[in-house]
Amino acid sequence: MLKGRNLLDPMDFSLEELEEVFKLADEIIEEPEKFLHVCDGKILATLFYEPSTRTRFSFEAAMLRLGGQVIGFSEPNSSSVAKGESVADTIRTVGCYADIAAMRHPKEGAPAIAAMYSEIPVINAGDGSHQHPTQTLTDLLTIRSLKGDLSNLTIGCCGDLKFGRTVHSLVKALSRYKNNKFVFMSPEELKIPDYIRKEILEKNNIEYKEVSKMEDAMAELDILYMTRVQRERFFNEDDYVRLKDSYILDGEKMRYAKKDMMVLHPLPRVNEIAYEIDQDPRGCYFKQAKYGMYVRMALIAKLLGVR
Protein backbone atom coordinates (compact mmCIF):
# COMPACT_ATOMS: atom_id res chain seq x y z
CA MET A 1 0.00 0.00 0.00
CA LEU A 2 1.28 3.43 -0.96
CA LYS A 3 -1.40 5.40 0.91
CA GLY A 4 0.13 8.20 2.98
CA ARG A 5 3.65 7.71 1.63
CA ASN A 6 6.01 10.42 0.35
CA LEU A 7 7.91 10.30 -2.94
CA LEU A 8 11.21 12.14 -2.49
CA ASP A 9 13.64 9.92 -4.39
CA PRO A 10 13.11 7.35 -7.17
CA MET A 11 14.46 4.69 -4.79
CA ASP A 12 11.64 5.29 -2.27
CA PHE A 13 9.40 2.76 -4.00
CA SER A 14 10.24 -0.89 -4.61
CA LEU A 15 10.05 -2.22 -8.18
CA GLU A 16 6.77 -3.91 -7.24
CA GLU A 17 5.36 -0.60 -5.97
CA LEU A 18 6.47 1.17 -9.14
CA GLU A 19 4.71 -1.49 -11.18
CA GLU A 20 1.53 -0.83 -9.14
CA VAL A 21 1.68 2.81 -10.20
CA PHE A 22 2.36 1.93 -13.84
CA LYS A 23 -0.51 -0.57 -13.99
CA LEU A 24 -2.89 2.03 -12.61
CA ALA A 25 -1.58 4.54 -15.19
CA ASP A 26 -2.31 1.94 -17.89
CA GLU A 27 -5.90 1.67 -16.60
CA ILE A 28 -6.30 5.45 -16.62
CA ILE A 29 -5.00 5.66 -20.21
CA GLU A 30 -7.41 2.91 -21.31
CA GLU A 31 -10.54 4.16 -19.50
CA PRO A 32 -10.05 7.73 -18.22
CA GLU A 33 -13.79 8.20 -17.65
CA LYS A 34 -13.68 5.67 -14.79
CA PHE A 35 -11.43 8.01 -12.81
CA LEU A 36 -13.23 11.33 -13.24
CA HIS A 37 -14.42 11.49 -9.62
CA VAL A 38 -11.98 9.40 -7.57
CA CYS A 39 -10.53 12.54 -5.96
CA ASP A 40 -13.79 14.40 -5.37
CA GLY A 41 -13.34 16.54 -2.27
CA LYS A 42 -9.52 16.20 -2.31
CA ILE A 43 -7.08 19.10 -2.71
CA LEU A 44 -3.56 19.12 -4.15
CA ALA A 45 -1.18 21.92 -3.11
CA THR A 46 1.47 22.83 -5.71
CA LEU A 47 4.36 24.59 -3.94
CA PHE A 48 6.66 25.74 -6.72
CA TYR A 49 9.65 27.79 -5.61
CA GLU A 50 11.09 27.54 -9.15
CA PRO A 51 9.52 28.12 -12.59
CA SER A 52 7.85 25.16 -14.28
CA THR A 53 5.52 24.50 -17.18
CA ARG A 54 5.18 20.74 -17.72
CA THR A 55 5.62 19.53 -14.15
CA ARG A 56 3.26 22.05 -12.55
CA PHE A 57 0.65 21.91 -15.30
CA SER A 58 0.71 18.11 -15.42
CA PHE A 59 0.25 17.88 -11.64
CA GLU A 60 -2.64 20.33 -11.82
CA ALA A 61 -4.20 18.63 -14.85
CA ALA A 62 -3.77 15.25 -13.15
CA MET A 63 -5.65 16.34 -10.03
CA LEU A 64 -8.39 18.09 -11.99
CA ARG A 65 -8.91 15.04 -14.23
CA LEU A 66 -9.31 12.93 -11.08
CA GLY A 67 -12.06 15.25 -9.86
CA GLY A 68 -9.96 17.05 -7.25
CA GLN A 69 -9.01 20.69 -6.80
CA VAL A 70 -5.70 22.58 -6.73
CA ILE A 71 -4.27 25.37 -4.61
CA GLY A 72 -0.72 26.68 -4.50
CA PHE A 73 1.82 29.12 -5.87
CA SER A 74 3.97 29.10 -9.01
CA GLU A 75 6.76 31.34 -7.70
CA PRO A 76 7.75 32.19 -4.12
CA ASN A 77 7.15 35.94 -4.34
CA SER A 78 3.41 35.31 -4.47
CA SER A 79 3.42 33.60 -1.06
CA SER A 80 4.63 34.20 2.50
CA VAL A 81 7.97 32.74 1.43
CA ALA A 82 8.71 36.30 0.28
CA LYS A 83 8.32 37.33 3.93
CA GLY A 84 10.87 34.77 5.06
CA GLU A 85 8.62 31.84 5.97
CA SER A 86 10.46 28.53 6.30
CA VAL A 87 9.71 25.38 4.31
CA ALA A 88 8.68 23.67 7.56
CA ASP A 89 6.12 26.35 8.44
CA THR A 90 4.82 26.52 4.87
CA ILE A 91 4.12 22.78 4.70
CA ARG A 92 2.56 22.74 8.18
CA THR A 93 0.18 25.50 7.12
CA VAL A 94 -0.60 23.99 3.73
CA GLY A 95 -1.33 20.68 5.44
CA CYS A 96 -4.26 22.37 7.18
CA TYR A 97 -5.91 22.96 3.80
CA ALA A 98 -4.70 20.28 1.37
CA ASP A 99 -4.60 16.48 1.27
CA ILE A 100 -1.34 16.12 -0.69
CA ALA A 101 1.48 18.45 -1.80
CA ALA A 102 3.91 18.62 -4.72
CA MET A 103 6.99 20.75 -4.04
CA ARG A 104 9.66 22.10 -6.38
CA HIS A 105 12.57 23.91 -4.75
CA PRO A 106 15.99 25.21 -5.85
CA LYS A 107 17.67 23.82 -2.72
CA GLU A 108 18.58 20.14 -2.62
CA GLY A 109 16.74 18.32 0.14
CA ALA A 110 14.01 20.94 0.68
CA PRO A 111 11.15 18.49 -0.09
CA ALA A 112 12.70 16.00 2.35
CA ILE A 113 12.66 18.68 5.05
CA ALA A 114 9.03 19.43 4.20
CA ALA A 115 8.17 15.74 4.53
CA MET A 116 9.68 15.65 8.04
CA TYR A 117 7.18 18.27 9.21
CA SER A 118 4.20 17.35 7.03
CA GLU A 119 1.06 15.46 7.98
CA ILE A 120 0.14 14.98 4.32
CA PRO A 121 2.06 13.12 1.56
CA VAL A 122 4.82 15.19 -0.06
CA ILE A 123 5.95 14.63 -3.64
CA ASN A 124 9.33 15.96 -4.73
CA ALA A 125 8.69 17.82 -8.00
CA GLY A 126 12.41 18.60 -8.38
CA ASP A 127 14.97 19.83 -5.85
CA GLY A 128 17.90 21.80 -7.23
CA SER A 129 20.23 19.59 -9.29
CA HIS A 130 19.47 16.62 -7.04
CA GLN A 131 16.41 14.49 -7.93
CA HIS A 132 13.20 14.64 -9.97
CA PRO A 133 11.36 11.40 -9.17
CA THR A 134 8.06 12.12 -10.92
CA GLN A 135 9.94 12.89 -14.13
CA THR A 136 11.60 9.52 -13.64
CA LEU A 137 8.21 7.83 -13.29
CA THR A 138 7.22 9.63 -16.50
CA ASP A 139 10.34 8.37 -18.27
CA LEU A 140 9.89 4.80 -17.03
CA LEU A 141 6.22 4.68 -18.04
CA THR A 142 7.11 6.05 -21.49
CA ILE A 143 9.85 3.45 -22.03
CA ARG A 144 7.69 0.63 -20.62
CA SER A 145 4.75 1.60 -22.84
CA LEU A 146 6.71 2.08 -26.07
CA LYS A 147 9.47 -0.51 -25.62
CA GLY A 148 7.52 -3.09 -23.63
CA ASP A 149 10.24 -3.57 -21.01
CA LEU A 150 12.57 -1.70 -18.68
CA SER A 151 15.41 -4.23 -18.84
CA ASN A 152 18.14 -5.15 -21.37
CA LEU A 153 18.48 -1.59 -22.65
CA THR A 154 21.41 0.60 -23.64
CA ILE A 155 20.60 4.11 -22.51
CA GLY A 156 22.51 7.17 -23.72
CA CYS A 157 22.37 10.31 -21.58
CA CYS A 158 23.50 13.46 -23.36
CA GLY A 159 24.08 17.10 -22.42
CA ASP A 160 24.14 18.51 -18.90
CA LEU A 161 24.77 15.44 -16.78
CA LYS A 162 26.24 17.37 -13.85
CA PHE A 163 23.26 19.56 -12.95
CA GLY A 164 20.58 17.50 -14.74
CA ARG A 165 18.44 16.14 -11.90
CA THR A 166 16.31 14.20 -14.39
CA VAL A 167 19.38 12.24 -15.51
CA HIS A 168 20.46 11.51 -11.92
CA SER A 169 17.03 10.14 -11.06
CA LEU A 170 16.71 8.16 -14.29
CA VAL A 171 20.11 6.45 -13.91
CA LYS A 172 19.28 5.52 -10.32
CA ALA A 173 15.94 4.05 -11.38
CA LEU A 174 17.04 2.16 -14.50
CA SER A 175 20.06 0.74 -12.67
CA ARG A 176 17.58 -1.37 -10.66
CA TYR A 177 16.39 -3.26 -13.73
CA LYS A 178 18.32 -6.18 -15.25
CA ASN A 179 21.10 -5.85 -17.82
CA ASN A 180 20.83 -2.14 -18.50
CA LYS A 181 23.93 -0.30 -19.74
CA PHE A 182 24.65 3.42 -19.88
CA VAL A 183 26.57 5.71 -22.23
CA PHE A 184 27.27 9.26 -21.02
CA MET A 185 27.90 12.08 -23.51
CA SER A 186 28.79 15.48 -22.11
CA PRO A 187 31.45 18.20 -22.00
CA GLU A 188 34.16 17.63 -19.40
CA GLU A 189 32.66 20.38 -17.22
CA LEU A 190 29.21 18.74 -17.16
CA LYS A 191 30.06 15.08 -16.55
CA ILE A 192 27.89 12.75 -14.49
CA PRO A 193 28.57 13.33 -10.75
CA ASP A 194 30.93 11.01 -8.89
CA TYR A 195 28.21 9.90 -6.48
CA ILE A 196 26.17 8.48 -9.38
CA ARG A 197 29.21 6.87 -10.94
CA LYS A 198 30.59 5.34 -7.75
CA GLU A 199 27.58 4.76 -5.49
CA ILE A 200 25.09 3.63 -8.13
CA LEU A 201 26.96 2.25 -11.13
CA GLU A 202 30.30 0.94 -9.91
CA LYS A 203 28.97 -0.28 -6.57
CA ASN A 204 26.39 -2.40 -8.42
CA ASN A 205 28.71 -3.48 -11.25
CA ILE A 206 26.61 -1.77 -13.89
CA GLU A 207 28.30 -1.32 -17.25
CA TYR A 208 28.82 2.26 -18.42
CA LYS A 209 31.15 4.34 -20.54
CA GLU A 210 31.76 8.01 -21.28
CA VAL A 211 32.28 9.30 -24.81
CA SER A 212 32.99 12.74 -26.19
CA LYS A 213 31.17 12.41 -29.54
CA MET A 214 27.54 11.43 -30.01
CA GLU A 215 28.35 9.64 -33.26
CA ASP A 216 30.61 7.22 -31.38
CA ALA A 217 27.66 5.77 -29.46
CA MET A 218 24.48 6.34 -31.49
CA ALA A 219 24.44 2.94 -33.22
CA GLU A 220 24.22 0.97 -29.97
CA LEU A 221 21.53 3.00 -28.18
CA ASP A 222 17.98 1.87 -27.48
CA ILE A 223 17.17 5.13 -25.68
CA LEU A 224 18.75 8.56 -26.17
CA TYR A 225 17.93 10.87 -23.26
CA MET A 226 18.72 14.45 -24.27
CA THR A 227 18.98 17.35 -21.82
CA ARG A 228 19.50 21.06 -22.17
CA VAL A 229 22.44 22.94 -20.69
CA GLN A 230 20.69 24.79 -17.86
CA ARG A 231 21.42 28.49 -17.82
CA GLU A 232 19.92 28.85 -14.32
CA ARG A 233 22.59 26.54 -12.82
CA PHE A 234 25.52 28.69 -14.05
CA PHE A 235 27.08 31.55 -12.13
CA ASN A 236 29.14 32.63 -15.14
CA GLU A 237 27.30 33.55 -18.35
CA ASP A 238 30.44 33.02 -20.43
CA ASP A 239 30.61 29.39 -19.30
CA TYR A 240 26.99 28.86 -20.28
CA VAL A 241 27.47 30.40 -23.73
CA ARG A 242 30.59 28.28 -24.29
CA LEU A 243 28.88 25.00 -23.39
CA LYS A 244 25.25 25.41 -24.52
CA ASP A 245 25.88 24.22 -28.09
CA SER A 246 28.08 21.26 -27.14
CA TYR A 247 25.68 18.51 -28.19
CA ILE A 248 22.93 19.06 -30.74
CA LEU A 249 20.87 16.19 -32.14
CA ASP A 250 20.00 16.63 -35.81
CA GLY A 251 19.00 14.50 -38.77
CA GLU A 252 22.61 13.78 -39.70
CA LYS A 253 23.35 12.21 -36.31
CA MET A 254 20.07 10.26 -36.39
CA ARG A 255 21.37 8.43 -39.48
CA TYR A 256 23.67 6.49 -37.14
CA ALA A 257 20.82 5.40 -34.84
CA LYS A 258 18.71 2.24 -34.74
CA LYS A 259 15.37 2.36 -36.52
CA ASP A 260 13.57 1.78 -33.21
CA MET A 261 15.68 4.00 -30.96
CA MET A 262 13.64 6.37 -28.77
CA VAL A 263 14.65 9.99 -28.25
CA LEU A 264 13.43 11.32 -24.90
CA HIS A 265 13.80 14.78 -23.35
CA PRO A 266 12.34 16.09 -20.07
CA LEU A 267 11.79 19.49 -21.76
CA PRO A 268 11.97 22.44 -22.09
CA ARG A 269 14.05 22.22 -25.22
CA VAL A 270 16.36 25.08 -26.18
CA ASN A 271 18.41 24.09 -29.22
CA GLU A 272 19.75 20.64 -28.33
CA ILE A 273 17.21 18.81 -30.52
CA ALA A 274 16.71 20.18 -34.03
CA TYR A 275 13.06 20.75 -34.95
CA GLU A 276 13.41 18.32 -37.86
CA ILE A 277 13.54 15.49 -35.29
CA ASP A 278 9.93 16.29 -34.32
CA GLN A 279 8.88 14.63 -37.60
CA ASP A 280 10.95 11.52 -36.92
CA PRO A 281 8.85 8.74 -35.29
CA ARG A 282 11.78 8.10 -32.95
CA GLY A 283 11.27 11.51 -31.35
CA CYS A 284 9.05 10.59 -28.40
CA TYR A 285 9.42 13.63 -26.11
CA PHE A 286 5.90 15.02 -26.59
CA LYS A 287 4.38 11.58 -26.02
CA GLN A 288 6.56 11.51 -22.92
CA ALA A 289 5.00 14.76 -21.67
CA LYS A 290 1.51 13.23 -21.99
CA TYR A 291 2.56 10.09 -20.13
CA GLY A 292 3.69 12.46 -17.37
CA MET A 293 0.12 13.51 -16.67
CA TYR A 294 -1.11 9.92 -16.55
CA VAL A 295 1.61 8.71 -14.21
CA ARG A 296 0.99 11.66 -11.87
CA MET A 297 -2.72 10.82 -11.86
CA ALA A 298 -1.84 7.28 -10.82
CA LEU A 299 0.65 8.47 -8.20
CA ILE A 300 -1.81 10.92 -6.62
CA ALA A 301 -4.53 8.26 -6.51
CA LYS A 302 -2.16 5.76 -4.86
CA LEU A 303 -0.77 8.17 -2.25
CA LEU A 304 -4.28 9.33 -1.33
CA GLY A 305 -5.46 5.73 -1.14
CA VAL A 306 -8.41 6.27 -3.45
CA ARG A 307 -7.20 3.46 -5.76
UniProtKB/Swiss-Prot annotation:
<dbReference type="Pfam" id="PF02729">
    <property type="entry name" value="OTCace_N"/>
</dbReference>
<dbReference type="InterPro" id="IPR036901">
    <property type="entry name" value="Asp/Orn_carbamoylTrfase_sf"/>
</dbReference>
<comment type="similarity">
    <text>Belongs to the aspartate/ornithine carbamoyltransferase superfamily. ATCase family.</text>
</comment>
<feature type="binding site">
    <location>
        <position position="268"/>
    </location>
    <ligand>
        <name>carbamoyl phosphate</name>
    </ligand>
</feature>
<feature type="binding site">
    <location>
        <position position="55"/>
    </location>
    <ligand>
        <name>carbamoyl phosphate</name>
    </ligand>
</feature>
<feature type="binding site">
    <location>
        <position position="135"/>
    </location>
    <ligand>
        <name>carbamoyl phosphate</name>
    </ligand>
</feature>
<dbReference type="InterPro" id="IPR006132">
    <property type="entry name" value="Asp/Orn_carbamoyltranf_P-bd"/>
</dbReference>
<dbReference type="GO" id="GO:0006207">
    <property type="term" value="P:'de novo' pyrimidine nucleobase biosynthetic process"/>
</dbReference>
<feature type="binding site">
    <location>
        <position position="165"/>
    </location>
    <ligand>
        <name>L-aspartate</name>
    </ligand>
</feature>
<dbReference type="InterPro" id="IPR006130">
    <property type="entry name" value="Asp/Orn_carbamoylTrfase"/>
</dbReference>
<dbReference type="InterPro" id="IPR002082">
    <property type="entry name" value="Asp_carbamoyltransf"/>
</dbReference>
<keyword id="KW-0665">Pyrimidine biosynthesis</keyword>
<feature type="binding site">
    <location>
        <position position="83"/>
    </location>
    <ligand>
        <name>L-aspartate</name>
    </ligand>
</feature>
<dbReference type="GO" id="GO:0004070">
    <property type="term" value="F:aspartate carbamoyltransferase activity"/>
</dbReference>
<dbReference type="Pfam" id="PF00185">
    <property type="entry name" value="OTCace"/>
</dbReference>
<dbReference type="GO" id="GO:0006520">
    <property type="term" value="P:amino acid metabolic process"/>
</dbReference>
<feature type="binding site">
    <location>
        <position position="104"/>
    </location>
    <ligand>
        <name>carbamoyl phosphate</name>
    </ligand>
</feature>
<comment type="function">
    <text>Catalyzes the condensation of carbamoyl phosphate and aspartate to form carbamoyl aspartate and inorganic phosphate, the committed step in the de novo pyrimidine nucleotide biosynthesis pathway.</text>
</comment>
<protein>
    <recommendedName>
        <fullName>Aspartate carbamoyltransferase catalytic subunit</fullName>
        <ecNumber>2.1.3.2</ecNumber>
    </recommendedName>
</protein>
<comment type="subunit">
    <text>Heterododecamer (2C3:3R2) of six catalytic PyrB chains organized as two trimers (C3), and six regulatory PyrI chains organized as three dimers (R2).</text>
</comment>
<comment type="pathway">
    <text>Pyrimidine metabolism; UMP biosynthesis via de novo pathway; (S)-dihydroorotate from bicarbonate: step 2/3.</text>
</comment>
<dbReference type="GO" id="GO:0044205">
    <property type="term" value="P:'de novo' UMP biosynthetic process"/>
</dbReference>
<keyword id="KW-0808">Transferase</keyword>
<feature type="binding site">
    <location>
        <position position="267"/>
    </location>
    <ligand>
        <name>carbamoyl phosphate</name>
    </ligand>
</feature>
<feature type="binding site">
    <location>
        <position position="54"/>
    </location>
    <ligand>
        <name>carbamoyl phosphate</name>
    </ligand>
</feature>
<dbReference type="InterPro" id="IPR006131">
    <property type="entry name" value="Asp_carbamoyltransf_Asp/Orn-bd"/>
</dbReference>
<feature type="binding site">
    <location>
        <position position="228"/>
    </location>
    <ligand>
        <name>L-aspartate</name>
    </ligand>
</feature>
<feature type="binding site">
    <location>
        <position position="132"/>
    </location>
    <ligand>
        <name>carbamoyl phosphate</name>
    </ligand>
</feature>
<dbReference type="GO" id="GO:0016597">
    <property type="term" value="F:amino acid binding"/>
</dbReference>
